Amino acid sequence: MALQIIAYVVALIMVVGACFSLLAAVGLVRFPDLYTRMHAASKAGTVGSGLLLFAAGLHSLDAAVFVRALAGFVFFVLTAPISAHLLAKAAHQAGYRMSKRSVIDQLPHKEEARRH
């Protein structure tokens, strides 16, 4: 009975993780500019991948595998948004413009940064 409950929990976590990954993929295709696409990939993709990794660790029924999966999940959650932020900042400094639908640009452009 306990194994069946674990199997259902793993299946539920995998479905939720797959939905987040699907939302990240849709965001990559549908969003208008580099910055919003990176936001979709880093946020929803991180949650989706992390949930799938967590489900795989739980499915193994081995404490060592589960701890490794959990460590990988924590590492991924800590590093993916930071790397996306740094890539977006580098793209902004390289001159990639935001979409016209974007509301505000809080980073100064190269010319403005040099004047200060």
Curated annotation (Swiss-Prot):
InterPro entries: PhaG_MnhG_YufB (IPR005133). It holds the Pfam family PhaG_MnhG_YufB. It comes from the Bacteria. One of its GO terms (molecular function) is sodium:proton antiporter activity. Belongs to the UPF0091 family. PANTHER family: ANTIPORTER SUBUNIT MNHG2-RELATED. This is UPF0091 protein R00998. It comes from Rhizobium meliloti (strain 1021) (Ensifer meliloti).
